[in-house]
């Protein structure tokens, strides 16, 4: 089973870290619970919360020697925002990803932009890695609402990291149900969807839950 590496910048607050890590744990538990209760040979994946790591006895400025190196290498100095495509490319090319493939999920405080220069809240390489940011969420006056939105954003990118929805099953890469896998490209929509899903008492819809379980099995047996 592929492990899940969690990283975040030092500027992420303690309450944000707690929501981030606990939400990943909950999402993976939901996925694992879709597997047969008896006779399953698939263990739950190990979740490794590394935070802002630095390799022991290494110069932090050396290639792949620290989480900060990834950030510095992907930072757009003109806009002071992170180039997400560049960041994820570095993650996928790291030496230990080649030796022991695993999932990567990163939470940062700075603004993000994609390859077309568009401002975004997160980006994923489906089935491999994802990055998300609290930058937009911190514009909210209500801290509780910001944490609820962070929970929803984290659940969405855990699903993306696992490559859910499965397009071959549904013919689309976007979920249409009341579900955290619905894309929310604006802060207003993210808040609206978060509140709607809370009121409905749901996170992942039934189909997305099933597909997350399938993805865990696939990663365990090398089909991811």
Language-model features: where?
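Glycine-rich, flexible loop segments associated with nucleotide phosphate handling
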Residues: 78-81, 146-150, 175-178
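A structure-centric signal for secondary-structure junctions around beta-strands
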Residues: 1-3, 101, 126, 175-178
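Propeptide-to-catalytic entry region of secreted or membrane-anchored zinc metalloproteases
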Residues: 1-114
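Metalloprotease/metallohydrolase-associated module, dominated by Zn2+-dependent proteases
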Residues: 127-144, 165-224
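Residue-level recognition of short, structured coil/turn motifs
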Residues: 29, 33-37, 146, 163, ...
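Low-complexity, polar-biased intrinsically disordered regions enriched in Pro/Ser/Thr/Gly
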Residues: 61-66, 119, 169-170
